[in-house]
From Swiss-Prot:
Subcellular location: Secreted, Cell wall; Cell outer membrane
Organism: Chlamydia muridarum (strain MoPn / Nigg)
Family statement drawn from the similarity comment of this UniProt entry: Belongs to the PMP outer membrane protein family.
Keywords (A to Z) from UniProt: Cell outer membrane, Cell wall, Membrane, Secreted, Signal, Transmembrane, Transmembrane beta strand
Record keyword Transmembrane present: yes
Pfam families reported in the protein's UniProt record: Autotransporter (PF03797), Chlam_PMP (PF02415), ChlamPMP_M (PF07548)
Membrane topology: Peripheral membrane protein
Domain of life: Bacteria
Matching InterPro entries: Autotransporte_beta, Autotransporte_beta_dom_sf, Polymorphic_membr_middle, POMP_repeat
UniProt name for this protein: Probable outer membrane protein PmpD
Signal peptide, first to last residue: 1-20
Lineage start: Bacteria, Pseudomonadati, Chlamydiota, Chlamydiia, Chlamydiales
Amino acid sequence: MSSEKDKKNSCSKFSLSVVAAILASMSGLSNCSDLYAVGSSADHPAYLIPQAGLLLDHIKDIFIGPKDSQDKGQYKLIIGEAGSFQDSNAETLPQKVEHSTLFSVTTPIIVQGIDQQDQVSSQGLVCNFSGDHSEEIFERESFLGIAFLGNGSKDGITLTDIKSSLSGAALYSSDDLIFERIKGDIELSSCSSLERGGACSAQSILIHDCQGLTVKHCAAGVNVEGVSASDHLGFGGGAFSTTSSLSGEKSLYMPAGDIVVATCDGPVCFEGNSAQLANGGAIAASGKVLFVANEKKISFTDNQALSGGAISASSSISFQNCAELVFKSNLAKGVKDKCSLGGGALASLESVVLKDNLGITYEKNQSYSEGGAIFGKDCEIFENRGPVVFRDNTAALGGGAILAQQTVAICGNKSGISFEGSKSSFGGAIACGNFSSENNSSALGSIDISNNLGDISFLRTLCTTSDLGQTDYQGGGALFAENISLSENAGAITFKDNIVKTFASNGKMLGGGAILASGNVLISKNSGEISFVGNARAPQAIPTRSSDELSFGAQLTQTTSGCSGGGALFGKEVAIVQNATVVFEQNRLQCGEQETHGGGGAVYGMESASIIGNSFVRFGNNYAVGNQISGGALLSKKVRLAENTRVDFSRNIATFCGGAVQVSDGSCELINNGYVLFRDNRGQTFGGAISCLKGDVIISGNKDRVEFRDNIVTRPYFEENEEKVETADINSDKQEAEERSLLENIEQSFITATNQTFFLEEEKLPSEAFISAEELSKRRECAGGAIFAKRVYITDNKEPILFSHNFSDVYGGAIFTGSLQETDKQDVVTPEVVISGNDGDVIFSGNAAKHDKHLPDTGGGAICTQNLTISQNNGNVLFLNNFACSGGAVRIEDHGEVLLEAFGGDIIFNGNSSFRAQGSDAIYFAGKDSRIKALNATEGHAIVFQDALVFENIEERKSSGLLVINSQENEGYTGSVRFLGSESKVPQWIHVQQGGLELLHGAILCSYGVKQDPRAKIVLSAGSKLKILDSEQENNAEIGDLEDSVNSEKTPSLWIGKNAQAKVPLVDIHTISIDLASFSSKAQETPEEAPQVIVPKGSCVHSGELSLELVNTTGKGYENHALLKNDTQVSLMSFKEENDGSLEDLSKLSVSDLRIKVSTPDIVEETYGHMGDWSEATIQDGALVINWHPTGYKLDPQKAGSLVFNALWEEEAVLSTLKNARIAHNLTIQRMEFDYSTNAWGLAFSSFRELSSEKLVSVDGYRGSYIGASAGIDTQLMEDFVLGISTASFFGKMHSQNFDAEISRHGFVGSVYTGFLAGAWFFKGQYSLGETHNDMTTRYGVLGESNATWKSRGVLADALVEYRSLVGPARPKFYALHFNPYVEVSYASAKFPSFVEQGGEARAFEETSLTNITVPFGMKFELSFTKGQFSETNSLGIGCAWEMYRKVEGRSVELLEAGFDWEGSPIDLPKQELRVALENNTEWSSYFSTALGVTAFCGGFSSMDNKLGYEANAGMRLIF
């Protein structure tokens, strides 16, 4: 038996002989049906006949060459000379086939098993050696090279296991190689060459209009080493290779060096091909590679080379208008330092173009250099019709999926685009730039993703720095370039779970878990949601290296100067503009200990970040962790959030500044947005929500609410966790668990800090070890629970601004302005907070700054600043329930000023407290030179201090100047400055120029002096004190102005000076208003203390004229039941002087010596309440008193209770409406016609009535309305006799005609009814019983409101007789007209039980009933139409009702607080009523009927009366 080696040699020799015969007889044989060559078979003869023919005209349609060459002659057959090349020497080979050869393929060509690699010059099964072409040949010939032209459905070419030593083991042409219309498959497999083109090599290759192409396991052995850079990617080709140098770079048919696969209608497959030492595992071209208009799947699988694992080209690579493209598991194994460019699938020195394809997939391609799937100068993916997928591609350096040196454009695609699971050192999915290894320099390009219709996603990409060599840029988990644009895309754009692991280095930019751009990032005009979720940048441990490398690593660590940032996005300038929805969620930035610059858990814009015009923006659950790492969500030099419909920053965390936003240099602007929310953000040092270290925070022009809630800045300690972050492995499950644990620990540390008790007494605080000065300095650097800035402007917002439950460890629970670092305090900018021009309320509620006994000089529960200005606001400004060590609401630092103006709303301080004040504390003035500049309020508005004003170091202060209340510079300042219930010590002279200064609820106001101008008013309540402090301070210029005003005023007043020579008054008051509402005469209460004026010991009275007027600040007037119900003595005023803390009667002023005029409130005709007399003022025990003696009570009509009694009328009205509906629709002639039948029916009803009269205003009318539904069943027990039952439910409302009172009503009604027809007489009767639940609210304005609930019941019994008179023929056929007079008797009764109201001005009502008997009468016109089973009756009724009997029982009402009772009554309705009714009853068949009815009514015959209303109903019935 022969050996395998012998068989192989035999096969080879036989195959060569067949090939020799073919080539030798090409011009001599006359017939050819099959070309077949195989090793041991002699049954397949070889025939070949040259056939003249033309290439199809449409070949020219895809002509790639110069346009002017398309018109050069016709394609004709050129037959080469006969010869046998295998017997010739290599030197003579080019002369054997000198011209082109055209093969007509009509049956399959199969050749396999030819191995010529042991022959040094073996080249090609079919060869063309044309040599250099003269111009004469080019002018004469239209085609040069080898062409296979199919001519039938069975044609095909199979070339298998062919090997040669030179290029093109199967086919070689120094000119073109063309496959045209081969409708059987073209299969080239296991072909190999020791040079280029394992299967085919030519000057250019065209495969056109063929059935399919399969190229497998071909290999090229050429070595690319030493090839110039310009020819580098065209050198190789495991299967196909083209080079433009074979024929002097000339080609008649297509450009030299190009490979084109066009309009093939079968699959194209390149699998397992390789060029181990060169480029282009499947294809290498010195020109272009073009796949165009192919109809079936094109796949490149498991190919490998140094660069371009599947395809490499010196020019462009294009796939256009093809079906599905698949590139899978291709490998570019060359490394960067060996001059390999990369491109796991494709590598081009020009553009890679993917256009108008039905689907594209790049999966598990790998590059040991750059571009895991694609490498090129430019990459264009546009107008594809199917999905584009890059999955699990890997690059050792940049561009896990794509690396382009200049631009990447992904535009106009119609379906989805996804990049998943890619890995690289930078640019996990796409990197754009020329990353030269020389001097670590990089020239970055741009990425444009725009106008795509489908969703775009970048998922689970990973960047892991593989070496310390690339230090300029590290990051870009998904995208990396100089400029990146995502614009005008219609689908959703998602960046999720992309991660960057980088070394801490002295590089310029480190980070960008999803996007890294050295220039601009523009995300604009996208219609779908844009989401960045779960992206991260984390430090990577420096790998184990040699001692020299370790030394370099240590040096690198020490010289870190780059910026680390952007858990999701890092760019120089970031603009997110006019998108639909933008979400940054759960992105994170983790930095090692040596990285001390940067931040931005989600976004880092080095120069600016602009988020403008988006519909919805959310930054949630992002965090930035590391040493001095700021901006839990966003970091930039300047930030602008403008014109967004909704903005939400929630649960972001930073371990240095700016829990949500950090602005490092410029300003942070929140301008012209809709709803803005900053909630649950956490910062460690400055700014729980926003930190703006060197600029301003501007909140202006927003059109919806702006809320800062539950933000915290505190100092947690978690050094152990930071160490874990630095050394963890990003790929391990353990790392993910540690990251989650880290975030949980950070959050818990914030929670623990904020949960500490605020109000512990100093001695009850736990003991602590000695705190060093350095530690105290660190503790002090914590401020701005919501905002930290140089200045804060809250202006011109349209809706409320809310700061709620924000917390700071030290300063400013909500807002801090200024600096805590000495280097920044030299700034000439004065820290200030300005709240101005807002239309909505501005509210600070529940904010807090923690008390630390080691830092007593801290605070500002809501605001800590130097200057505070609140002015020109149309809404209220409220400080409610804030807390701090000092300044429960506001802390003003030394040299600061406060200017408050209540313009279109009030300014209120209520419930604020501090540890230092041990209670109430509105504003704390620190240092010796802080002060209040002015307090102004416009008419109807007030500045209200329910908490104290506290000044530090009162005794040591220099003169704090003049405090002006309601400056006369604006005549509109006539409102009030009101102190309630607390003691405020203001070390300033107070000048009340106009408007009012009010001390209520026992308030104490201490100052250096008080002056009242003629237009000003001072109001004191019981127990309040106006106290003058003893001051040695010198008068400043402002006090001199006060002295000038004193000298110019001539109004008589109580003028008290420090001594007889004083020119500036301690007290200069002409009128004091005493608040009557503050006094009470209840026996169980202690008598109220008289208001006091207290001056220092030794004060001198210069004049003693004073007017006292009794006023009521609550507006109750004589409705003050507690004071005026009984005889009362009111202490009006007393004057004291303070001597060593004790109070004595003013020694130089006796009340009896005062010329005091007392005026009491007038009692006029419109005055309601307690009536009585005031006595003359008298002196008792050194106090001025006045007595009140009541004589009666005058009832306000709004308390009369008419609406309660009128509800009885409404109770009867519901019963009457149901009665009328049953008479109109259930007790009719139509119903009586169905003897012994049963009807089930349903009815909807409604009514409206307005009852009023000029004569009845004193009793009060009402408007009532209700709707309801009723259902019932009736039957005929005998002929012409019907009996039925029904039930109904309803709800409605009653409104008082004249006052603010209403009743909501709902109830049920049950009824029985009957009818009997006796000839022309129709008798009808019914009985109804109802129950109604009533809820009443009465509002009295300043007197409060009352509420009551009760149930009322009603009964109605009715009997009616109707005489039916026929008009017209005695026996009508279709139409009948009846005239029916009727008379009716109706009895109705309604009542309610006794009940008592709750609330202010509560009343007690006695049980009351209303009974009446009414006799309605009138006439009804009926027109009936009958045809078959159809019957319709329309009627018009006109009637009048006369009330014959009316009785009201009960009616007693008592005003409980006043102790006054009276007899109430319902409205005295007119006893006549006119009604007009329109009704329709239609029987559609013997089983179904419908009903409609409308009734209008009015009451009385006098124009003075007014009783109007309507009733409407609609229903149906089923007849059984």
